[in-house]
Amino acid sequence: MVSLLKKLIGSRNDRLLKEYRKQVAQINSLEPKISALSDEELLAKTQEFRDRHQQGTSLDDLLPEAFAVVREAGKRVFGMRHFDVQMLGGIALHNGKIAEMRTGEGKTLMATLPVYLNAIAGKGVHVVTVNDYLARRDAEWMGRLYRFLGMSTGVVVPQQPNDEKIAAYAADITYGTNNEFGFDYLRDNMEYRVEDRRQRRLFYAIVDEVDSILIDEARTPLIISGQAEDHTELYVRMNAVPPLLKRMASEPKPHEPEPEGDYWVDEKSQQVYMSEAGHESAEKILTRVGLLPEGESLYDPRHIALMHHMMVALRAHTLFFRDQQYVVQDDEVVIVDEFTGRLMVGRRWSDGLHQAVEAKEGVKIQHENQTLASITFQNYFRMYDKLSGMTGTADTEAYEFQEIYTLETVIIPTNKPMVRKDQNDQVFKTTQEKYQAILNDIRDCHERGQPVLVGTTSIENSELLAGLLRQAKLPHEVLNAKQHAREAEIVAEAGKPGHITIATNMAGRGTDIVLGGSVDKQVDLIHANEALSEAEKEVRIETLRAEWKPLNERVKQAGGLRIIGTERHESRRIDNQLRGRAGRQGDPGSSRFYLSLEDPLMRIFAGDRVRAIMERLKLPEGEPIEAGMVTRSIETAQRKVEGRNFDIRKQLLEYDDVANDQRKVLYSQRNEVLEAASIGATVEGLRDAAVAEMFRGFIPEESVEEQWDVAGLEKALAGDWHIQLPLTDMLEQEPNLTDEELLERVVAAARQIYTAKVEQVGAESWAQFERSIMLQSIDTHWREHLSALDYLRQGIHLRGYAQKNPKQEYKREAFELFSGMLDRIRDDVVRVLMTVRVQSAEQVEQAEADAAQRHVQNVQYHHSDYDEALADDGQPQGAQPVRNVLPKVGRNEPCPCGSGKKYKHCHGQLA
């Protein structure tokens, strides 16, 4: 029925493309007229568009003419004409949608269309890439077109001087990575001077590789942190504990005897759990190494931190492995991006995990950090007035884009039909059999002159395969995080006849593999050679292309680029990205995945079913199973994982939305403080409110005089705010004084003392001092609030045991924490300003300089893993325990939460 309806009225995608094609026809009709313009007339079009837009013409109405101008500029600057399908993609991007275009269809050039159109508004357009290399490359490459049309471009990269960053954001078009845009937003909300802020209002962003940034990295927030207290010795001593504990052969099953051992590992949830025997063993070991006093229990509230450190050490030993999740370089543990295989230099895991891995590897342990500011990409990118994205693989995640970002995915047709052959997976019983089949396939391609790209899921696997190829005497190149610097060079050679390239996940590589090899670098070198005349350059380039042509034909005859996958990834999208490297622009190509029942995805999610099929077929050793049914079975397993990951991201967003609402309120108030000419009226309001609250603590409203604690109020005013006021004497002299009149006198006294301070220092200097104190107080209490939210988040799932909704409880308690924080900011600001003794304007300036100095010390930037514990409401986790003070509970006693379970099977499991 659904398919019949689609045939009759077309799918939503078909209807959108039909609408867009009308606009493309309009753009094409303008081409002769625009082509007739001189370079100067084409440049003048930009100012004409700006004037028309200011006079009320919408960007939508300017689209046909603006796109036609960009197409003409592309022809004149690059000698490249935007295809009609690129126009379709450009219209989709302008309309705030995700354009899915196959690899090699020209996404970078397509983006120039909506970027130019939206830059006409003069509010700044951000083009977001996955790494600094692509940001610089695209800014330089596409910048030539924008400059030709009178638009300015900038690029933001890490460690860039602040004045350069400010200039880059002031440009019409700004290129940069998702991390840098996010960090700059956080930095702007930590600045103490308006002129030091970098970003303008977030107007329009185009996100390249949108699936990688908005989905793969959505669980990992950007964090700016500073150093916390030192636990170095504890990490080193705790590192000796995991090897002394015994791992269970399997996870305990209900109603079955518990397997022998101290702990089990849940690879699905990436957590480690202790058995009852394990807790006893751990206590004995910790006592023996001097970490736990004799006769005391790990369950004592004062040893909860010890428990946390032990569980972190166990995770470091059982779930995090060298050359898979991280590498060791220059005496440092460097995280490897699970999705792209890139080294994530400078990023650190949170909750002490990074320090535990450093202790395991015997490298220098760096200090733990306190979060200063944090935001997820989900919440950062949703702040843009308009957001769009482009990728080669978005359709599998279209539902998530729509659900979380309200971004619709439009599948753009290819310029030429795709002829790549995607063969069924081959599944072997063992890894050894799988690698033998891969070697045979690679050898066959190499002998026939067909280039091969082999995709692996980890650095370890890529180096294992490289070792096998060396033994087989097959020449090859390895492209992984360790070869990052040579990446573009390796990719340029990957399409040459018989070339073998091994690569970790190719997501976000950003460089096309051209059949016969790429000559772009040599062409660029010829263009840059000033010793050659233009005519000589043209001759050399023609010769170069003539030499490349037979190589290109030879590779096409051999079957184009061969893609070999050594494992299925959790996400079908990552597999599709690997396949998408072949078959660009109508080129031939083929792909196949080789799997074994020992692969992680197969073992955890699909192994039993496929193994049963293999046993029924009684396949001999080395013989694979290859059938559409098996491929579908694997894709079903991948869908399950994708569904679970989507649920986790959605849960995370629901929790983070609470923090995000608070962040927006606080940052808005902070910006008001920063931008206001004077905050004197604000401070006065805070002071009067603080005085009234203190006053009512001793003299409640509508109370009789016998209930008043006047002596206590006098003491509090003198101790907290240095207000010496003889309230007792006043009441004796004027017995008819009401509480309201008494409050007015206290408020007036506070105002008088404050006015004297202002007059002594000077109104201008004091106003600056007020601002500085207010900003410091906001920042300090916000940091503490972020830590409090973190602790709350880690333990909130326990409320599920008490038949409460953890999300509702989190919202309620987070609101209470936020209200309490605002009160503490108020009290802190009033206390400092009332008690500080300032004699001159010079002292004020020195205090501000000291604050600014403290403000920038030991700041680090992370994109660390969010703890998944909060995403699985009510499910037991091995996360950091809740820090509260509880009476000691025996493991076999009933749990104090009231669930009726034994403590060891309930909250004891989470300790």
Curated annotation (Swiss-Prot):
Per the record, membrane topology reads: Peripheral membrane protein
Instruction: Tell me the residue numbers annotated for binding Zn(2+).
Output: 895, 897, 906-907
The cofactor named in the record is: Zn(2+)
- Which biological process annotations from GO are given for this protein? intracellular protein transmembrane transport; protein import; protein targeting; protein transport by the Sec complex
Kindly give the SUPFAM superfamilies that the UniProt entry links to this protein: Helical scaffold and wing domains of SecA (SSF81886), P-loop containing nucleoside triphosphate hydrolases (SSF52540), Pre-protein crosslinking domain of SecA (SSF81767)
Q: Name one GO cellular component term.
A: cell envelope Sec protein transport complex
Per the entry, the cofactor note is: May bind 1 zinc ion per subunit.
Assembly, per entry: Monomer and homodimer. Part of the essential Sec protein translocation apparatus which comprises SecA, SecYEG and auxiliary proteins SecDF-YajC and YidC.
Q: What is this protein called?
A: Protein translocase subunit SecA
Organism field: Bordetella parapertussis (strain 12822 / ATCC BAA-587 / NCTC 13253)
GO molecular function annotation: ATP binding; metal ion binding; protein-exporting ATPase activity
Task: Note the SMART domains from the entry.
Answer: SecA_DEAD, SecA_PP_bind
Query: Which protein family is it in?
Result: Belongs to the SecA family.
Q: What does this protein do?
A: Part of the Sec protein translocase complex. Interacts with the SecYEG preprotein conducting channel. Has a central role in coupling the hydrolysis of ATP to the transfer of proteins into and across the cell membrane, serving both as a receptor for the preprotein-SecB complex and as an ATP-driven molecular motor driving the stepwise translocation of polypeptide chains across the membrane.
UniProt entry keywords in alphabetical sequence? ATP-binding, Cell inner membrane, Cell membrane, Cytoplasm, Membrane, Metal-binding, Nucleotide-binding, Protein transport, Translocase, Translocation, Transport, Zinc
What catalytic reaction does the record list?
ATP + H2O + cellular proteinSide 1 = ADP + phosphate + cellular proteinSide 2
Q: Where does ATP bind?
A: 86, 104-108, 512
Q: What is its EC number?
A: 7.4.2.8
Matching InterPro entries: Helicase_ATP-bd (IPR014001), Helicase_C-like (IPR001650), P-loop_NTPase (IPR027417), SEC_C_motif (IPR004027), SecA (IPR000185), SecA_CS (IPR020937), SecA_DEAD (IPR011115), SecA_motor_DEAD (IPR014018)
Give the start-end ranges of region Disordered.
Answer: 869-888
The record's section on PROSITE patterns has:
SECA, SECA_MOTOR_DEAD
Tell me, in one coarse class, where this protein mainly resides: membrane
Q: Where in the cell is it found?
A: Cell inner membrane; Cytoplasm
List the NCBIfam families hit by this protein, alphabetically.
Answer: PRK12904.1, secA
